[in-house]
Amino acid sequence: MAEAVERTDELVREYLLFRGFTHTLRQLDAEIKADKEKGFRVDKIVDQLQQLMQVYDLAALRDYWSYLERRLFSRLEDIYRPTINKLKTSLFRFYLVYTIQTNRNDKAQEFFAKQATELQNQAEWKDWFVLPFLPSPDTNPTFATYFSRQWADTFIISLHNFLSVLFQCMPVPVILNFDAECQRTNQVQEENEVLRQKLFALQAEVHRLKKEEQQQEEAAALVQHKLPPYVSSMDRLGDSELALVCSQRPASLSQSPRVGFLSSLLPQSKKSPSRLSPAQGPPQAQSSAKKDTFSSQATKGKDPVPGAKDGKSLLSGPVPGEASWTHQRQRRLQDHGKERRELLSTSSSQTQCAEKKLEGSGPEAELCLDLHMGPVEALARVSTAGSEGDRPEQPFIVLSQEEYGEHHSSIMHCRVDCSGRRVASLDVDGVIKVWSFNPIMQTKASSISKSPLLSLEWATKRDRLLLLGSGVGTVRLYDTEAKKNLCEININDDMPRILSLACSPNGASFVCSAAAPSLTSQPDSSAPDIGSKGMNQVPGKLLLWDTKTMKQQLQFSLDPEPIAINCTAFNHNGNLLVTGAADGVIRLFDMQQHGCAMSWKAHCGEVYSVEFSYDENAVNSIGEDGKFIQWNIHKSGLKVSEYSLPSDATGPFVLSGYSGYKQVQVPRGRLFAFDSEGNYMLTCSATGGLIYKLGSEEKVLENCLSLGGHRAPVVTVDWSTAMDCGTCLTASMDGKIKLTTLLAHKL
């Protein structure tokens, strides 16, 4: 505690010097020098007591102990009163012993003279009144203990420990917790960094194990694909099976009409043809035997001629057993071919080709099937390699995703306050919800507006206040803690639609965009005007209002003609204001000169959303033409980059249902938001938020992460980086708001 007090004293001195409060600073230094509590340093308090004893200043000793009782000991409970009394008694005895040891009996007699009234009725002091008159009190059994060095040390240590425990347990002001909070914060940050590294290590280990498992599965699938069981059985269809079939064939079988199949099969047999017949001759004999076979085929086998009679080999003529074996082999090859075609899902033309070749010749059919299998295997290997190759590490880790579901209609705005602790959301029915999400998701305030609301903005300095722009020309200041409207001001009756609100970072003013009714709005409609594409080309005003007085300061000039301003945004210090209008023009205003510094045609159609970049050297915009463009603010109209976005990222947003139900909503809230360093951008999509990487040289934005979680189109987003972990908000047309907590992957 003493260190915290000393540190706080230095901070207060620094603050007073910074503010110029020199008189207060001198007074503070003077009081610190005369501080009796010694900055809550126990050693200095004990030293002060000993110094008073050494100079025999009994009055000062009594006053100092009374001060300690009044300032410190009085805060203790009554159960500690006996301990305090014992310490006081021991302190006075310690003083008496010191006077006797230093041969100052006069000071001992003075002590009893001044304290007699207080001590004479206390039993523990009855024997001590004779102390100044004893010749050798250190040898007296009653007082010998108090003259020992051990007793003196024990008393000093006991007093020191008592004061230390007292200072540790006493309540302290909030400012003294500053140092402890800093240390605790540093400790938590160190622990978070250790846990972050462990998380990344575990993630890398999981990725490695998954990759190894997938590689093993891929290898197993490849081997299984290359060697199916029936292919292995086909490899065994050789002369050994032929010999087995020939040994079991009946002698009365008829001749086969397809002896050519056997003649085409034998030259490609894997085994030696000598096993077929011991009577097989040289190649010339084989060729003559083939000729005889073909000539005998013309007779169609009317009279069976046994080979034993003619003394010829098995190949010299049609043998009845060979016809049966040939038929069985051909059928088996056909069955295997069909199984292969079903497995590989070949095209109908390939199937017809395979069937024709199977009917013609066995080896050619096998070759055809092998050729058909090759491209399929290659394609499988390419797709597997493409999907399971080395992927770049994700820039963010999704820690959690929660849903806020207290809205029952499409969301228009959803914004996090400056502190990153609360969220304000507004739907098309005029329902405002203010809710927190840390540590638990909880609604803090809820309100329903009688008039339609079109815009929403958090106040910057007093972050408990909300600015709400209506469709009837008013701006309302709502206190989220008191849950009531503080005031409501009338902006303009001719231009009732308050399309955009932006509060200056200094908190002194806010800008307000007022526009005439849209070309499709109905005067008698009670529903909010959620817009229609291309129908916002109406006059508008851009006004500056004072936050404290709630009075209009000035009206900005909109050249070449007044037009509806859809979106507004300040830079970090409030010196610049950027606006996007319905005529597709971006205007940059100098808030010190209160004039338009530059303007340029940015989009074909309306500008839906505009923001400053992270370094504030550029302006980013999304327009009706479906493009996301970065503009250099130092050169008017100079594009830094341009990207085309999907239609579900820019709007208009469409929600379809049964029986032809269709809801169309033109963007009102923010369509994109950046991370803390401006390297990644969050946008809308049909199923959830999408995070893109910025700054790449590609012509297409790199999609890094899909947050998902929505069943309806997302219409507005926000990204808060006030906390250690980034918080992404995505709000959709079904009234659901997803809150996704991300952890940045620090490389």
Swiss-Prot record:
Keywords of this entry: Coiled coil, Endosome, Membrane, Phosphoprotein, Repeat, WD repeat
Modified residues (Phosphoserine): S256, S288
Molecular function, one GO term: phosphatidylinositol 3-kinase inhibitor activity
Location of region: Disordered: 265-358
Residues in WD repeats: 406-445, 448-488, 511-555, 560-599, 602-641, 664-702, 709-747
Any one Gene Ontology cellular component term annotated for this protein: late endosome membrane
Tree of life domain: Eukaryota
PROSITE patterns according to UniProt: WD_REPEATS_2, WD_REPEATS_REGION
Biased composition (Low complexity): 265-278
Compartment(s): Early endosome membrane; Late endosome membrane
Subunit and interaction comment: Interacts with WDR81; involved in early to late endosome cargo transport. Interacts with BECN1; negatively regulates the PI3 kinase/PI3K activity associated with endosomal membranes.
Function, as annotated: Functions as a negative regulator of the PI3 kinase/PI3K activity associated with endosomal membranes via BECN1, a core subunit of the PI3K complex. By modifying the phosphatidylinositol 3-phosphate/PtdInsP3 content of endosomal membranes may regulate endosome fusion, recycling, sorting and early to late endosome transport. It is for instance, required for the delivery of cargos like BST2/tetherin from early to late endosome and thereby participates indirectly to their degradation by the lysosome. May play a role in meiosis.
Family statement drawn from the similarity comment of this UniProt entry: Belongs to the WD repeat WDR91 family.
Protein's name according to its UniProt entry: WD repeat-containing protein 91
Native species: Rattus norvegicus (Rat)
